[in-house]
UniProtKB/Swiss-Prot annotation:
Active site: residue positions: 810, 896
UniProt keyword Signal present: no
Pfam family, one: RdRP_2
Family: Belongs to the Tymoviridae non-structural replication polyprotein family.
Organism: Kennedya yellow mosaic virus (strain Jervis bay)
Residue ranges constituting the Peptidase C21 domain according to the UniProt record: 757-912
Annotated ranges, domain (+)RNA virus helicase C-terminal: 1130-1266
Residue ranges with Pro residues bias: 619-635
Residues annotated as domain Alphavirus-like MT: 58-219
Sites where the protein binds ATP: 1002-1009
Name this protein carries in UniProt: Non-structural replication polyprotein
Site (Cleavage): 905-906, 1288-1289
Length: 1874
């Protein structure tokens, strides 16, 4: 890091190159070696992977290769990795000889090459085959291990005893362990098909190959175990899909920790270490599974950085909408480093983020709690865990109370005595029965399992057990029967005195004494006192509940916590753990544990053995028992095509136990075992294939039936060996296959597939009918109307069943009155011919009866029915029937049949409104298909459309007939012009007319014309005429119809057709005709009844060649005729399938050969090919050269049967999608492009559709025609049959998909907030000061920082311009505004000022239909008006003057002159600010964060919410940040330069990506703060200043000397690379982060627009446009002059110097390097930013203000603009009489006229602005409420109170530069201490 800082310090000095010389010397050898070893052109996105893998590649490779990264990996493996491993004599297997020779030259130990031809491709790869196996200790197998099984490798080690190490390269994707989608799609892709893995390197399909899917098992095993030999497997290296594996003889020694028992416990491991391997995958996290759903792991892997960023984002925004996570994901999904993520994973990620965004960790951080509060908080958080821990203790405590003799002591009166008498005697002692000893109880019960303990000892366990158990009292009573126990119970012994006393009293009581005497004798108790006495004793309340109560009480805690766990909330600790586990998943790692592989017996390494294997010992037994046989239903695995061994492959999965190599056969088929019973009784080890007579390789054995083909899943095997050598052309050792064993039944063990169960339809399962299902007309052949009796039925067998009458029986009730038959009789009759399944089903129950039943009724009762439906009259029944009934059908919903209304008098039933030709057109078929329309439509003409067209035709603006043949004399009224004049007069009196019409629409070449021509050839349509837009199309109609010469008048062009009359009019290519032509044709022909129009709305519209035509102002025919399109034919007969496939259109013209046969480029014109060009002039030039040609537009509708040539020129890039579609679809063979191949580059400056066609990329018509394509009702195949079946609410064939299938997104208002998911609350403080962002597009919101301001606003309020001085007003000479305005505008022709280029005229001086009242012309003609909506030529004509383009798409390279000049300008800019150019200030992160918040505020407040929503594309992640959209600025700029001026180029605005604005905008605001801090007082910049500030500065600093002003010509375009250097140096001076500086330089040197790449010019719209222009201007001024302290004013390209300074000495040298054009002027009345300035102050230019007033008055907008103009006027008015010293004499009358107008027309509250007194609140309220529009200068000129009131009165600011932002910048400058 220190060296890098030192080099950066030397960047601008001459010492840097010598300092870097050692660095260059150190990398020279490495770079040279890398270029020689890896010379291939590795893609840029794969280089980081290779470098991370330790491969020293370079980015200077020049050799192309179809898969360079794989070639680099292989080269590194062979010449770096293997080169160091080969330390002994080695052999190499499966390598081309040339590659081996190169390897041998690098390392002499590579001695032998052995190749074996195992597959057909090996004969090409290997010119010869080795006759023996390798015999060296080291063997290197090149890219073949994936085709081998462990048994085969074991066989190789058996055959070659010298072999110790086998080094193998394995190519297999490790992620195939769990998915079929690559994790490195740029490096490789693969697919899984059955048991085969198809591997494609780097998208190179020709280099793809197949390999067994079980090849992955080599990465999952660590050893191969067999009875005689064990092999160990080690993964040495892994480079993505390439792995280096070492297979060694023997196993490694066991871990010493398992063997040495004397090791300390911490060093001794009881189990072996886990053999875990991991592989390189992108950094990702695994999303959790959805609840109770299974989602594949591959679709749950998302990038770690995206997940963490999205997690933070969803919790950082204040309001999260439903679309915000998806918008954030969209900003990341298109990044190249995320190609491996699947669309399902992105979907799961945004869904997961959306659904889990409300979750927050339920934690608290209470650090100031006392111990009691901490205990309380701990218990509240962990009470459930504490309860669960205490529950077992409570359970044991309940049982302990039962077992232990615990009691509760209570006080009780023992005795009460008085006068030596007991009033309350103590209770007699009662001895509870004692329990026997446990041992004694067991002895008395004499249990068989009890053994008495030795004498003197007791069983402690049994004693404790019985003491814990409570023995009920009943059991105790039974135990008393044992005398041995009760004899052991002795009473408590008494002392001798008590014994003597008791004996004496007992003797006295036995004497014959009187009772009274005996009553006074003391008994055997204590003496009773004389005085009253009460004694107490303690009574123990036993705590011994019953058993059931004790057990129930013990279970209460457990049940309570179980219920709490099931139904209660999760405890906080568990919530915390689940939250972090669920929302912060660990990084995904692709790893697994390797396990041993058991191989019971080896299988041949090759399909032929060179030497027999040594026999195994007889007493040898396998290490593991043999596995059970495979189930017979499991098919063998398929093998790979290259170097694949023939042995059977194991079951896919983990390699645990290998299957035996011998084939399983029945015992009777074994020729070596004649005694099946004897062999069945023994269990010998499996026999190895290495015997003296090796068996033939395994082959699929057929079954006993010779007709059964072999299974296609069985592996292909080779024959046995007949010769040890192969000839050069031979593939392998092949021979005739051995005879097959006819008794082998291996394949017969496979289960036979069961035939699928046939599900019968209700009709076939109906028991009331018999026979096959046939149509009703076949079963009952009669003359039914077409397509009415084609429904399926069967022959009725049983008599009518009493089916109930359905509730939807309106068909029967509609037919019954006309037939005079009861509906129930009709219902019964239907049951005689139709099965019950057709009469009782869900259709009849839900939607009603169909016309199928009406056909059946017509057969039964011999009638025909006319059904009057909404789509016309439809006939049902018998054509020959005499009885005709009428019924009516309405679609509803619900659909309904009804009888005809009653006939009154002799009136017939009401006639149908159907056109008489409609039925004929609907029934007509051409080659078995109907015309693609549903019904006739009623079209009502628009007289306004017709009048507009005929007026333009009469004047010659549209069409040519009115202007041709001027010299020919016609009879009066018969010339074309006179006829059009007469037609125009007729249209003036015409009324709207309605005719029938149908529209045939479809893709180009779909066959609209041929079927219609056949229809017109029929008799009903013979009276027709055809109108075409071109003569070429008219000639095609003539040729195809082939009518007699007398009928040629029926084919005419569109103008001559207006002068003819027929009943039927056919208009071909309607959309190529002028708007209103259809209306004019109908109104001009009184005989017209039917109109048939053909056209494709996708193939473009009519465009008038006259700039004076107003036809384009009418509504487009594509949208006007859209409701009449019933079907859009989505197929083509003309376009070749190669081209049709680009549009996803089915084509009947199948292409032959390669795609280039249909679409290709050419170097010259091809004879016989028709040429399509862009313009008429080009077509005439090509025709003059002898080649047939026409314009692309004129070729619409024409079919060419040869290839057409499309001429490309610079206009091809501007072709519309409609024209390019026409060009690509004209030929039945194909197209070829000739000319400007740059139009096919696929960039912004090319034709998109042509580019996609030449590169065979799909063309999305939805994006090419976004306004109309989604509205077209696509018909995917021709209509072969029209359904006349009516049922339900609609007819299925005429269902309009436009109404249901297409759903346009609804308009969402900006205030819509119902899609909020999370709305985070505001903690503490007041309302959030940030602006709302919920209306921003989802892709814009992640770019918004939403930082809160860190510094509080404590600055004082800005002072107004009011003063307390004595008010004074200037003296005006007096001038009437209206009188001066009447003669201000000179009489002139505004069209002379317009510019005409390429037959297009500008419209900057519109005058037609413009109001005017002040003078003889509209006042808007004073200056050019720029209106892009009204002037389509504005931007194209202005581009040459406003933009400067690069010659190529390569980035602009900064030259040495740019660096030199940029540094010179930077030094002079620092001199202007009095700065040290070498000083670099520290970066202030806090201030920069404030600037980010301020920039966000400015972006949200400077435009309305509707504007931000409308500009949602600016945050589109698919929009490259270097791409800029250029558009014209709409303005009516009125100043001294534009008044009475000519055409002027507009100002271009650059629309940049939001990323650029939000990233670099804070940088410019950060710089602006430091510039304001450093700016000396004599420097003035107008940014953020009001006119009052300008006037005050002028009064302070300007003098009365002659001023020097300058305004540059094309200032923005004149700034080249030096401006980029200047801006980068300005940012480096403030230590702006380097990535932002690099971003700025990258943008300036890589800007691309829709018109082409731009140079390093200034773009209006880039961040900091004004500041950078002002700094550039100021740097140029200080480079030109020696300014010192001369006052200077700068504002963009405008500047003013107080007096003439001396020139700088270096100016002449600097001037030659600049590209600026100066417009310097010396004057005493300088004009700066529209204000005349001087020592007296500043005043608004009265000439411009007067002109603006005139324009506003004539535009009737003065009421809205008057306050703005008055505010600008007040700045100079308040100067008093001093203002006259600032104005030139020629402008003083306009100042007086403006004052006259304001005095007479402004209301009093507005005129208060002219006063110098402070405005009262009432006036401020009136001004703010009446303000609708304010200019920027006017807004700044308002007092601060009014500005705040105006802002508060508006819901959202719409000022181009919010003045609050300048105020906040000023506050930041005051708040931060520098």
């Amino acid at each position: 890091m220190a060296f890098q800082l030192a080099l950066d310090a030397l960047a601008s000095t001459s010492h840097k190159d010598p300092s870097l010389h050692p660095v260059l010397e150190s990398v020279h050898d490495s770079l040279t070696d890398s270029l020689q070893t890896y010379p291939w052109m590795v893609p840029q996105d794969l280089q980081p992977f290779l470098l991370k893998s330790g491969i020293p590649i370079n980015s200077f490779g020049s050799s192309p290769h179809p898969h360079p990264a794989h070639k680099t990996l292989e080269t590194h493996l062979l010449f770096t990795h293997w080169m160091h491993l080969c330390t002994q004599p080695s052999s190499v297997l499966f390598m081309k000889p040339q590659k081996f020779m190169k390897l041998q030259r690098k390392n002499k130990f590579f001695q032998h090459l052995h190749n074996y031809r195992l597959t057909p491709t090996d004969s090409v790869r290997f010119p010869s085959t080795s006759p023996h196996l390798p015999n060296t200790p080291f063997v290197f197998m090149h890219d073949a291990l994936m085709y081998y099984q462990p048994e085969q490798i074991l066989h190789l080690f058996h055959q070659v005893p010298q072999l110790t190490n086998l080094f193998c390269s394995l190519v297999t994707p490790p992620e195939s362990h769990f998915t079929h989608l690559s994790l490195m799609p740029d490096l490789y892709t693969f697919t899984l098909k059955g048991q085969t893995l198809h591997y494609t390197p780097e998208g190179h399909s020709a280099g793809s190959y197949n390999q067994p899917i079980t090849a992955l098992s080599w990465l999952k095993i660590n050893s191969i175990l067999s009875p005689n030999l064990n092999l160990s497997i080690t993964i040495l290296e892994s480079w993505g899909p390439l792995h280096s594996i070492l297979i060694q003889r023997g196993l490694p020694l066991p871990d010493p920790k398992l063997l040495v028992r004397s090791l300390p416990p911490f060093s001794r491991s009881p189990d072996p270490e886990t053999d875990l391997v991991s592989f390189q995958v992108p950094k990702s996290v695994e999303l959790p599974q959805a609840t109770f759903l299974s989602q594949p792991l591959r679709h749950r892997l998302v990038p770690e950085s995206v997940y963490n960023a999205l997690f933070t984002y969803t919790r950082a925004v204040r309001t999260l909408r439903v679309s915000d996570p998806a918008g954030f994901v969209r900003t990341q999904s298109n990044k190249p480093e995320h190609k491996w993520v699947t669309p399902s994973a992105w979907d799961n990620l945004q869904t997961f983020a959306l659904l889990n965004c409300p979750l927050r960790p339920n934690v608290v951080y209470h650090v100031l709690l006392n111990p009691l509060q901490k205990m309380k908080l701990y218990f509240s958080q962990h009470w459930r865990r504490l309860g669960v821990i205490a529950a077992p203790g409570l359970f044991c405590l309940s049982l302990l109370l039962r077992s232990q003799k615990w009691s509760l002591p209570l006080p009780k009166a023992k005795s009460i005595s008085v006068f030596r008498r007991n009033l309350l005697l103590p209770p007699k002692p009662h001895r509870p029965p004692l329990l026997p000893h446990p041992e004694q109880m067991l002895q008395e019960f004499k249990l068989p399992w009890h053994r008495p303990p030795p004498k003197g000892k007791r069983n402690p366990f049994l004693t404790l057990l019985i003491n814990l158990l409570h023995i009920p009292r009943e059991i105790c009573a039974g135990i008393r029967r044992y005398p041995s126990y009760y004899q052991s119970i002795q009473p408590k012994p008494l002392n001798p005195i008590q014994q003597f006393r008791n004996q004496l009293l007992a003797q006295l009581h036995t004497l014959p004494l009187p009772k009274k005497f005996l009553s006074i004798l003391p008994r055997a108790r204590k003496d009773i006192p004389l005085l009253p006495r009460m004694s107490f004793t303690t009574v123990n309340l036993p705590l011994q509940p019953p058993m059931w109560l004790a057990i129930g009480a013990s279970l209460v805690p457990e049940l309570a916590f179980l219920l709490s766990w099931l139904s209660g909330d999760v405890d906080l600790q568990t919530q915390h753990d689940i939250y972090h586990h669920h929302l912060h998943p660990e990084n995904f790692t692709l790893s697994w544990t390797r396990t041993p592989y058991l191989a019971l017996a080896p299988s041949p390494f090759l399909p032929y053995a060179h030497s027999p294997l040594p026999p195994l010992p007889v007493n040898s037994s396998p290490l593991f028992p043999p596995p059970p046989p495979l189930p017979p239903s499991q098919p063998p695995l398929s093998q790979g095509p290259a170097t694949q061994a023939p042995s059977a492959q194991p079951t896919p999965g983990e390699p645990l136990l290998a299957p035996p190599t011998t084939e399983l056969k029945p015992e009777s088929s074994n020729p070596n075992n004649p005694n099946p019973s004897s062999s069945a009784g023994s269990n010998p080890p499996p026999k190895s294939s290495s015997s003296d007579n090796p068996p033939a390789p395994n082959k699929p054995t057929p079954t006993s039936s010779s007709t059964t083909p072999p299974s296609p899943n069985l592996p292909l095997q080779f024959g046995s060996i007949h010769s040890p050598f192969l000839s050069d052309g031979q593939l392998n050792y092949s021979a005739l296959p051995p005879p097959q064993d006819p008794t082998n039944t291996t394949l017969s063990l496979l289960p036979e597939p069961k035939p699928p169960t046939e599900v019968q339809s209700p009709l076939m399962a109906d028991p009331t009918c018999v026979g096959p299902a046939v149509s009703f007309s076949s079963l009952y052949p009669r003359d039914f109307f077409p397509n009415t009796a084609s429904f399926l039925t069967r022959l009725r067998l049983s008599p009518p069943t009493p089916l109930p009458m359905p509730k939807n029986n309106c068909l029967l009730t509609a037919v019954a009155p006309s037939l005079h038959i009861n509906p129930h009789r009709l219902w019964t009759s239907l049951q005689e011919v139709l099965p019950d399944s057709l009469l009782s089903n869900s259709e009849i129950d839900s939607v009603g009866m169909s016309t199928d039943l009406l056909t059946a009724l017509s057969h039964l009762f011999n009638f025909q029915a006319v059904v009057h439906s909404e789509r016309g009259d439809i006939l049902f029944g018998l054509q020959s029937a005499k009885t005709v009934i009428h019924i009516y059908h309405t679609n509803g919903p619900p659909a309904h049949y009804s009888p005809p209304p009653k006939i009154i008098g002799s009136n017939s039933p009401p006639s149908s409104q159907q056109h008489p030709l409609e039925q004929a057109a609907l029934r007509f078929k051409y080659q078995g298909s109907h015309l693609p329309f549903s019904s006739f439509h009623s079209f009502t003409t628009s007289v306004q459309h017709a009048k507009n067209l005929i007026s333009n035709m009469k004047n010659g603006f549209d069409g040519v007939m009115s202007t041709i043949e001027p010299s020919i004399r016609h009879q009066p009224g018969h010339s074309p012009r006179e006829k059009f004049i007469a037609l125009d007069a007729m249209i003036d009196l015409a009324r709207p007319k309605t005719v029938s019409m149908f529209h045939l629409a479809g893709f180009a070449g779909c066959g609209k014309t041929k079927p219609l021509q056949s229809l017109l050839s029929t008799r009903p349509f013979h009276s027709f005429r055809v109108s075409t837009p071109t003569t070429e199309l008219r000639n095609e109609w003539k040729k195809d119809m082939n009518l007699p010469a007398s009928q040629a008048f029926r084919f005419c062009t569109w103008e001559s057709s207006l002068l003819k009359q027929t009943k039927i009019l056919v208009i071909d290519e309607i959309y190529k005709l002028p708007r209103g032509y259809l209306d004019l044709c109908i109104l001009a022909d009184p005989c017209l009844e039917l109109v048939i129009i053909l056209g494709d709305p996708l193939q473009g519209e009519y465009h008038s060649t006259s700039p004076h035509s107003s036809n384009h102002q009418l509504q487009s025919e594509t949208t006007r005729l859209l409701p009449f399109i019933d079907h859009y034919c989505w197929w083509t007969y003309r376009v070749p399938s190669h081209i049709a496939d680009l549009f996803s259109v089915p084509s009947f013209n199948r292409s032959e050969g390669h795609y280039q046969m249909a679409v290709r480029t050419a170097d010259s014109y091809t004879p016989g090919h028709f040429n399509l060009v862009n313009s008429v002039a080009t077509a005439n030039a090509v025709i003059q050269l002898g080649f047939p040609a026409t314009t692309i537009s004129a070729s619409q509708g024409v079919t060419h049967h040869n290839r057409v040539t499309i001429l490309l020129d610079k206009h091809s890039r501007l072709l519309s999608p409609s024209n390019t579609l026409v060009a690509l679809t004209r030929s039945t063979v194909g197209v070829e492009f000739l000319g400007d191949i740059g139009s096919l580059s696929g960039t912004n400056n090319s034709s998109d559709m042509f580019s996609r066609a030449i590169y065979r990329q799909p063309i999305n018509l939805s994006s090419s025609f976004p306004r109309i394509f989604h509205l077209l009702p696509l018909l995917n195949k021709p209509i072969s049959r029209r359904s006349t079946r009516l049922i339900g609410s609609h007819s299925p064939i005429f269902h309009n998909p436009r109404l249901t299938n297409i759903h346009l997104p609804p308009h969402i208002p900006t205030s819509y907030s119902q899609d909020f998911v999370v709305s985070n609350p505001i903690f503490q403080g007041q309302a959030d000061p940030r602006l709302d962002t919920h209306f921003l597009p989802p892709t814009r919101l992640p770019l918004q920082s939403e930082l809160l301001p860190a510094q509080l606003s404590q600055t004082t309020k800005p002072t107004d311009s009011f003063t307390n001085n004595t008010p004074f007003t200037p003296v005006y000479p007096g001038e009437n505004f209206e009188n001066l305005a009447a003669f201000f505008l000179p009489a002139h022709d505004p069209e002379l000022k317009e510019v005409t280029r390429r037959d297009q005229t500008s419209a900057q001086f519109p005058w037609f239909d413009r109001p005017f009242s002040l003078s003889c012309q509209p006042s808007s003609l004073i200056a050019a008006k720029h209106s892009p909506s009204q002037d389509p030529t504005l931007l194209p004509f202005s581009i040459p003057k406003r933009l400067r383009f690069r010659k190529s798409d390569n980035p602009h390279v900064l030259s040495a002159i740019d660096v030199l000049l940029g540094n010179q300008l930077f030094f002079n800019l620092c001199k202007a600010y009095r700065r040290n150019p070498t000083h670099v200030g520290p970066f202030n992160p806090a201030l920069f964060a404030e600037c980010i918040a301020l920039n966000d505020y400015a972006q949200l407040s400077s435009k309305t919410q509707a504007t931000l929503v409308a500009n949602h594309s600016r945050s589109d992640p698919d929009w490259r940040h270097t791409a800029v959209k250029i558009f014209a600025k709409s303005q009516h700029k009125v100043n001294d330069a534009s008044i009475f001026g000519n055409w002027k180029a507009c100002q271009t605005l650059a629309l940049m990506h939001d990323f650029v604005i939000l990233s670099l905008g804070p940088v410019k605001k950060y710089q602006r703060i430091f510039d304001a801090l450093d700016r000396p007082p004599h420097l003035y910049t107008h940014c953020g200043k009001s006119p009052a500030d300008l006037s005050a500065w002028c009064q302070t600093h300007l003098t009365g000397q002659i001023k020097l002003t300058n305004d540059y010509t094309a200032f923005d375009q004149s700034q080249h690379g030096e401006s980029v250097i200047l801006e980068a140096l300005k940012m480096k001076r403030l230590s702006i982060p380097s990535h932002l500086i690099q971003l700025h330089v990258h943008l300036k040197t890589n800007v691309a627009t829709q018109f082409g790449p731009l140079t390093c010019m200034r773009l209006t719209g880039e961040p900091g446009t004004y500041d950078d222009n002002s700094d550039y201007n100021l740097a140029v001024i200080h480079s030109q002059f020696d300014m010192k302290d001369i006052p200077v004013m700068v504002s963009g390209d405008d500047s003013l110097i107080d007096r003439q300074p001396p020139l700088a000495q270096s100016w002449e040298a600097t001037k030659r390097l600049l590209h600026l054009r100066f417009k310097t002027e010396k004057t005493t009345h300088p004009l700066f930013c529209g204000y005349y300035t001087g020592s007296a102050g500043a005043i608004r230019n009265p000439l411009a203000l007067f002109s603006k007033l005139m324009i506003a008055i004539d535009d009737e907008a003065i009421h809205d603009r008057r306050l703005s103009y008055l505010t600008e006027f007040s700045t100079g008015h308040q100067l008093g009489d001093a203002l006259w010293t600032l104005l030139p004499e020629s402008t003083q009358i306009y100042q007086s006229a403006c004052f006259d107008y304001f005095c007479r027309h402004s209301p009093p509250h507005e005129k208060a602005l002219l006063s110098s007194f402070e405005l009262p609140d009432s006036v401020i309220s009136k001004i703010s409420s009446s303000t609708k529009w304010l200019s920027k200068n006017a807004f700044y000129a308002l007092p601060s109170k009014i500005r705040k009131a105006v802002i508060a009165s508006r819901h959202s600011s719409s000022f181009p530069e919010n003045p609050d932002v300048s105020q906040l910048e000023f506050e930041l400058l005051q708040s931060f201490q520098f």
